[in-house]
């Protein structure tokens, strides 16, 4: 074999080896159709959550200021929970338009809206947790709660809660940015260094602060409340237990799927799970479960406010005296029925009964 033949053979082997090395490399996971799915699925659902959440939580704020006038810790927590949900839903029109088209609002709003979304998310979860603790003190430690459940302590704990929520949301403010790729503008979180580490920490932060800690506290508080109520001869006990069960089940049902999918995406990010089909399913699942979790902010006014008999009475008064486009509300028969029910109700005056009605 001469030198020319050796050279040709070497080149052929190089081409052969390079070809099969390229073929053996993992191909990028194509995710065609995921954005198209989001364009159809997300905007109408975001709009619905925005409208329902804006209406329900605005009514809560209006009633609290007009009738309750923030006289207790419970009132303070209800107000802050409503403000948290309002802050959260006010970001949804931006995300809805972004899902349908692209980000057209600039870098400043990209950072602000991302931050609003996270602050509303964390503060809402935290105030749900505080509502559970408030109920626990009112029913399990009724005497001690007379000193602990004051307006002053309510304001102090609320300020601390907002501070923690703002601090936990700082990554959304600092790392959110706009960039253009293939003539499409994005608003996303981008980490300059240790990208994988930051993504994993952010996801775990949501799992821990958004589900594990609040759920643990809720389960403890409500289990102790139920145990205390078992020793009370209270005609409202069964209703209370059903309501507690509903609160926990709804929280689990709306937030657990999103956190599970988020945790699975963390495993994909760490390359613990490496499956293209799974990644595609997770991208669809994160859109569906995130929207499901958003609906919970529409239910908060119903769970913590509208189901209370005193608050239904205030809402009746509010709509019966309303003016303008809602003037026909005062003619609604169901509101008059609620009003009649309120005036005909009779309750015992025990400490636990009084605190229980305030808490629920």
From Swiss-Prot:
Extracellular side: 1-39, 99-111, 176-206, 268-284
Gene that this sequence comes from: Ccr4
PROSITE patterns hit by this protein: G_PROTEIN_RECEP_F1_1, G_PROTEIN_RECEP_F1_2
A UniProt-annotated Pfam family: 7tm_1
Gene Ontology, cellular component aspect: external side of plasma membrane
Listed name of the protein: C-C chemokine receptor type 4
Post-translational modifications: In natural killer cells, CCL22 binding induces phosphorylation on yet undefined Ser/Thr residues, most probably by beta-adrenergic receptor kinases 1 and 2.
The protein's role, per its UniProt record: High affinity receptor for the C-C type chemokines CCL17/TARC and CCL22/MDC. The activity of this receptor is mediated by G(i) proteins which activate a phosphatidylinositol-calcium second messenger system. Could play a role in lipopolysaccharide (LPS)-induced endotoxic shock. In the CNS, could mediate hippocampal-neuron survival.
Record-annotated disulphide pairs: 110-187
Cytoplasmic domain ranges by topology: 68-77, 134-150, 227-242, 309-360
Recorded topology in the membrane: Multi-pass membrane protein
Family: Belongs to the G-protein coupled receptor 1 family.
Main localization, broad class: membrane
Highest rank taxon of the organism: Eukaryota
Tissues where this protein is expressed: Expressed in the thymus, macrophages and T- and B-cells.
Transmembrane segments: 40-67, 78-98, 112-133, 151-175, 207-226, 243-267, 285-308
Keywords of the record: Cell membrane, Disulfide bond, G-protein coupled receptor, Glycoprotein, Membrane, Phosphoprotein, Receptor, Transducer, Transmembrane, Transmembrane helix
């Amino acid at each position: 074999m001469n030198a020319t033949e050796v050279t040709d053979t070497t080149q052929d082997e190089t081409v052969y080896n390079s070809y099969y090395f390229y073929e053996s490399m993992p191909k990028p996971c194509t995710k065609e159709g995921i954005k198209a799915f989001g364009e159809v699925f997300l905007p109408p659902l975001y709009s619905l959550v925005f409208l329902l959440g804006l209406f329900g939580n605005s009514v809560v704020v209006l009633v609290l200021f007009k009738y309750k006038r923030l006289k207790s810790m419970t009132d303070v927590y209800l107000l802050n929970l409503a403000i948290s949900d309002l802050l959260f839903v006010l970001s949804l029109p931006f995300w809805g338009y972004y899902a349908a088209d692209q980000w057209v609002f600039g870098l400043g709003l990209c950072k602000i809206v991302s931050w609003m979304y996270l602050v509303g998310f964390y503060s809402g979860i935290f105030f749900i947790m505080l509502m559970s603790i408030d109920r626990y003190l009112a029913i399990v430690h009724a005497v001690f709660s007379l000193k602990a459940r004051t307006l002053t302590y309510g304001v102090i704990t609320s300020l601390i809660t907002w501070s923690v929520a703002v601090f936990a949301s700082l990554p959304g403010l600092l790392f959110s940015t706009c960039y253009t790729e293939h003539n499409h503008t994005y608003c996303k979180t981008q980490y300059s260094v240790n990208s994988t580490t930051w993504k994993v920490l952010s996801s775990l932060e949501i799992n821990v602060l958004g589900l594990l800690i609040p759920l643990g506290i809720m389960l403890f508080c409500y289990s102790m409340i139920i145990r205390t109520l078992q020793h009370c001869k209270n005609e409202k006990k069964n209703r209370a237990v059903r309501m507690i069960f509903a609160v926990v089940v709804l929280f689990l049902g709306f937030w657990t799927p999103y956190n599970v999918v988020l945790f699975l995406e963390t495993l994909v990010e760490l390359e613990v799970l490496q499956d293209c089909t799974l990644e595609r399913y997770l991208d669809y699942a994160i859109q569906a479960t995130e929207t499901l979790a958003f609906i919970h902010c529409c239910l908060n006014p119903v769970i913590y406010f509208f189901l209370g008999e005193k608050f239904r009475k205030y809402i009746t008064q509010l709509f019966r005296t309303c003016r303008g486009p809602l003037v026909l509300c005062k003619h609604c028969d169901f509101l008059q029925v609620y009003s009649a029910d309120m005036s005909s109700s009779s309750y015992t005056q025990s400490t636990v009964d009084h605190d229980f009605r305030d808490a629920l």
